[in-house]
Each structure stands twice: as C-alpha cells, then as structure tokens.
Amino acid sequence: MLRGCFLLLRWSILVAHRANGSPNPVNEHNKMVTKSAFLSLSKSDRFKTFLTRFQSFNNVTRRFVAGEDLADAVEAIRVLNQKGISASFDHLGESITSEAATREEVNEYLRVLDSIEENKLDSNVSVKLTQLGLDVSQELCYSNTRRIVESAAAYSNFVRIDMEESPKTDATLEIFKRLRNEFENVGIVIQAYLYRSVKDIEELLKIGARIRLCKGAYNEPAAVAFPEKADVDANYSKLTKLLLTSGIYHGLATHDENMIAAAEQFARELAIASDKFEFQMLYGIRRDLQEKLVREGYRMRVYVPYGRYWYPYFMRRLAERPANIWFVLRNMMRG
C-alpha cells in the first residue's frame, strides 16, 4: 500500500510540474489518471493516516481548509469580506448514517447562521444532503434540510444544496424542488460533466431555481459523465450561456480562466450587467484571480470549508487541479 502511495506521489510530481504547459492528449490523459487515483485515495483511511504523520502536510491543508472550528471559518470569511469577497460556509462532513449525527449537523448549521448574523458577515451556507440524512432516509434528510432553510429565511439568508455523486442526483433534486415550493432562499448545484445536466437546468429554470454551475469533482463512469476534459469544458460553456440568459441570479463556479473569459465575453455581448451573476471559487485556490475579478467589478463568492472531516474534501481538491498537488508536495518537502 505505502509503496504504491510513494509511486503515485512521484507520478503526481511529474504531472503537476507539467500542468501549466501546453495541453496535449498525453498530458490530459496523465491528468485524468492522476485525478482518478486521488479520488480513490480520498476514501482511504490508511493513506490519510500515512499523510497526517507529517506535520508539514497538516500545516499545508490550512491553505485549502479554514480550520477545524467555526471560529476559524468566521475569521477567514472576515478577511475575505474585507477584500470585497462574499463567502459560503461549508461544514465538512458527508455520508453520515446515524440519525443522531445528522441532528448534530443541523445544530452546527444553525450555529453558523447565528454567527453570520452576529458577526455581520457577507456569507451564505452550503450543505451536502448526505450530511443531513440522505443515506438514512429521504424524509429525515428533507426535514433536517428544511430546518436549516427555514432558519436562514428568518435571517434573510440563503442555503445552497451541493450536488454529490450521480447516484444521489435524483434524490437531491427531489428534495430541492420540495423546498423550493415553500422557500425562495434555497438554491442547487449542477455539475457540467453529467450528460443529464442540460435537461436538469431547463427544468430547474422553470421554477426559478438559483443554480451554482460547477464542472464536477467526483469519479463518475463514462456512462453518465463526459470522460474528456474538452467535452466537460464545452458543456460548461453551453450551460453558462443557458444560465446567463435566464434572467435569474446564478453562480459560475470555476477556476478555469478560459471559462471565466468566455462568460465575461458572452455577458458583454448580451449587455448582461456584472451584478446579475457571480463567479465562485474555492478557499485558497487562485486567490490572485479572485481579487482580480473583484477589482474588475465582478461579484465573487468563495466557498469556505471547515471542520474535522476535511480529508475527502482536501483530496478532491488535489484531484481537480494538478497544480494543487505540486503546491502541497513542494511545501511538504520544505517542512
């Protein structure tokens, strides 16, 4: 196991080091192999134990995760707000199978909403339904999520429901639509790498849904998702145009400068004002680009994760961008 981990790390150094070079089929294939490997490792307790032996690794995770406590996330968001950047709290945790544990997650999100109000933060919240009981029962999950959305409504705040692996998509959309029938302060995430997403967006726009569009970060089979990055990018651009012409306020979640430039150009061509949508990015990734977009007059929201269960989230971030792997490895070697 550990020998395989070391070989993967050596491979990742090579792929990450070349990540900023000119794209070609070989490089893109290598990136896809690396992504698949890191997504598999995101579920490995043994690999987590191996990595967390290194203090330098634990230190570098703070680049991408605000900390383990709510106070850490509050401070991180306060700093972002001072730069003109909005935020979205995410208490890390997923695949919870205990009803009691799902209640604890609800209580944590109620604390988050109280804290946003008390600290006058420019932030909403993001939730994963597997945190809130989706793997226990759909009705429990709906009830738990409704409590959070109702509490947010009392503060005139907003709740974004994250999308997880494709087997969860139908149930996630069903719960969202039930909530949207009662509340306006709830939105959903759609993943551009899924073939079904164009039809899902068309249906969601009919009910006025506010959508965060992302590319997708899970390891999906070719039967349900585009396997090639070029196809994902093309679909992301297509869906971006669909959202921007809907007249509804949406979020475009990407760190890809080509996707951002295409969205900017499309908005200019159709005279869509910069305050009619927002760009969204992840905490600690492309901070230079986040601040640049704000200076140019665009709205920017950063997804700020915190909590003890940071490992799967962190590994997915490494899987998404080889440059992140290089950053982590370089800092570990310095430590």
Can you say where each PLM-predicted feature lies in the sequence?
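Acidic, Ala/Val/Gly-enriched low-complexity intrinsically disordered segments
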Residues: 15-19, 26-28
